[in-house]
Amino acid sequence: VGVTTLTSLNDRDLKLIGYNRSVKNLVAHQSKLARQAKLDALVCSPFEVNIVRKIFKKEIITPGVQIGKRNYDQKRSMEAKKVNSDWLVIGRSVTRGNIKKNIQKLIKSL
């Protein structure tokens, strides 16, 4: 399993750490590398799933998925019902507060 770019990073953050690419450009590049390396799965932000799907034809895992609009520390997160991924990683949206109610809310949102 490979990782494209952390959901807590945006274009500005990439520049600060020395990348001269946009998030989308870096994700596309890393998707090509993952395909060449014959990885079984690739992790990417909800906003880059469509970019990755065009290049990488295997499983896509998507963190930064939220129930509702709260983003916590994620800069590139999205509501679960809008994500076209094979696997969704949903953390604090479920674990903070009443877990049973949050899971029911998640199921209803899908």
Protein language model annotation of sequence segments:
Residues V1-A41, S45-V49, K57-I61, I67-Y72:
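Conserved anion-binding
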Residues D11, V52, G97-I99:
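Short secondary-structure boundary/hinge segments and terminal tails
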Residues R21-A28, P46, S77, R96-K100, ...:
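Electropositive phosphate-/nucleotide-binding environments in soluble metabolic enzymes
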Residues L33, K101-L110:
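Catalytic-site microenvironment of enzymes
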Residues A34, V52, G91, L106:
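Conserved, mostly hydrophobic/aromatic
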Residues E48-I51, E79:
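Short acidic active-site motifs
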Residues I55-F56, N84:
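Short, structured coil segments at secondary-structure junctions
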Residues V65-I103:
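Glycine-rich phosphate-binding active-site loops on the catalytic face of alpha/beta enzymes
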